[in-house]
Swiss-Prot record:
The modification Phosphoserine is found at residues 78, 214, 284, 348, 382, 394-395, 397, 406, 436, 477, 547, 549, 581, 592, 681. Residues 392-417 have a biased composition (Low complexity). The keyword Cytoplasm applies. One of its GO terms (biological process) is organelle localization. The keyword Transcription regulation does not apply. Plays a role in mitotic spindle orientation and mitotic progression. Regulates the distribution of dynactin at the cell cortex in a PLK1-dependent manner, thus stabilizing cortical and astral microtubule attachments required for proper mitotic spindle positioning. May link microtubules to the actin cytospkeleton and focal adhesions. May be required for directed cell migration and centrosome orientation. May also be necessary for proper stacking of the Golgi apparatus. It is found in: Cell junction, Focal adhesion; Cytoplasm, Cytoskeleton; Cytoplasm, Cell cortex. InterPro entries: AKAP2_C, MISP/MISP3-like. Pfam families: AKAP2_C (PF15304). This is Mitotic interactor and substrate of PLK1. GO terms for cellular component: actin filament; cell cortex; focal adhesion; spindle pole centrosome. It comes from Pongo abelii (Sumatran orangutan).
Amino acid sequence: MDRVTRYPILGIPQAHRGTGLVLDGDTSYTYHLVCTGPEASGWGQDEPQTWPTDYKAQQGVLRQGVSYSVRAYPGQPSPRGLHLETGEDEGLKVYRLGARDAHQGRPTWAVHPEDGEDEEMKTYRLDAGDAVPRGLCDLERERWAIIQGQAVRKSGTVATLQAAPDHGDPRTPGPPRSTPLEENVVDREQIDFLAARQQFLSLEQANKEVPHSSPARGTPAGPSPGVSQAPKAFNKPHLVNGHVVPTKPQGKGVFREENKVRAVPAWASVQVADDPGSLAPVESPGTPKETPIEREIRLAQEREADLREQRGLRRAADHQELVEIPSRPLLTKVSLITAPRRERGRPSLYVQRDMVQETQREEDHRREGLHVGRASTPDWVSEDPQPGLRRALSSDSILSPDSILSPAPDARAADPAPEVRKVNRIPPDAYQPYLSPGTPQLEPSAFGAFSKPSGLSTVDTEAATSPKATMSPRHLSESSGKPMSTKQEPWKLPRGSPQANRGVVRWEYFRLRPLQFRAPDEPQQAQVPHVWGWEVAGAPALRLQKSQSSDLLERERESVLRREREVAEERRNALFPEVFSPTPDESCDQNSRSSSQASGITGSYSVSESPFFSPIRLHSSLAWTVEDPVDSAPPGQRKKEQWYAGINPSDGINSEVLEAIRVTRHKNTMAERWESRIYASEEDD
């Protein structure tokens, strides 16, 4: 078989008889059995047939050459088939090469009939004792058979029976002998490649003019070049272990399961079956034959279509797979001076195409209504058609103004822009420590920052106390019929806000409140999950997915803000320790911020309302009076109190515990001696 074109070099296109070598029930290959007996004495009806005495070479031919018939090169005598052409009239004959006469100590081959099944089968004895002296012609032919067996084996497509690499001696049905038959099979001559090429070309010509199936001849032509016909599963039971069963004498037969299985190894029972039905089903001559690779591709596509059908996904149209990859315009590159060279920063076209396709797929997912749990369960169908959701772009495109000013065209076509669009990026919990629960939420237009509606104050109080009569987040989402993740220009005032309030600055924004951190005493009421406009009440909930990058950005921003608060507090404590140190009733553990941090309650600090407002809370009503704490050390020795692991350092017991569990630096003895200035060891003295 040619490695490139996959044409069988050694196959005969019009083989009158196929050798049915069945490995599995639905294999569909045509096998030709090789016979290299002497040319002079063919298979007579009753005369014995002579086999060459060196059976090892024969075994090699039998093993390797089973799948391809030997085709003699021009000028060589062609080997005979296993049966005469004249014997066609006497019905089907199934020959079985048995290995029964091994006890006689000589390589005797017998063709055994099945015991009583078909009376018309006759027994033929082949004995090596009455071998005619072999002439030069026979040796020559044998050499050719071996060479071609090697050529077949080298192409790597030989079907080895039972998939075992070596099957021992054909005479002994017992455990296979371990003697390698390589030294006999190895050919030490060159293959005549010119002749092989000639033969290949003539084969190709023959295959071109022979139609794919010739009904006049009983059997289909050998598989035409590069064809693996898709095997149709036979509707009969699988065969036992490679044995093919004698078929009924009418021309169209099928394999039957064999009841009596001989103890012969399966590779030895090679049989000749004369029925066209046992071979691979022939496709109609109109259909173009496909190569194995094409077949794999077709099967994969069918599997994919099946899966799409099961999951309820539409078939991807071809125009969806075509992607516009943004590339630099050609005219900017045209310069007569510089030689064109590859841009280093850009990925290859394939990578770019994959990236663009991936983002397209994600956006389509989001636009179809964020089916997270739904894609794999198509049986749940919503009662009303879902309105198209806006395409939520990734976070970096939200931050670029041009993408905000011009939303995606298809989304704009889907439904007109609602009155107010909000971007919720930074939640007010970030500013929450500086606000009290009664104060209104910060508006994004006032501060130029993004904000998210907080759960601490209810919608009604927020709508009542808010200085601008903007719509509450819930009304906003209902009026627009869209999720909260849609975009708004943060630098423009919401269009719904009344004009009168625009210049008013409320003093609450600039009122400084004492920083007091305490965990909320009662857990916040669990809010009823809000049903968006596109959701059906009984349906499985669809979560709005936050893109991973925005989540990371939010987390990073929170940590930065938290760190800034801590640094500011430490700086205040360092500069004015007496002014800012907490009053004794506040210094207990459950009010301290770090202890609540250590206990895992973070991020939910409500800030207590104080009856009076002043820049900072002082110890006395006189501002900036420094009172010495009673137990203070002289100020030179006062060291900055540092919190460690959420433990209050002014607490004596805690510090004792800290001292007890502190890890001292382990030094080995040499290091200790070095630090105690003992430089020389005792041996040196």
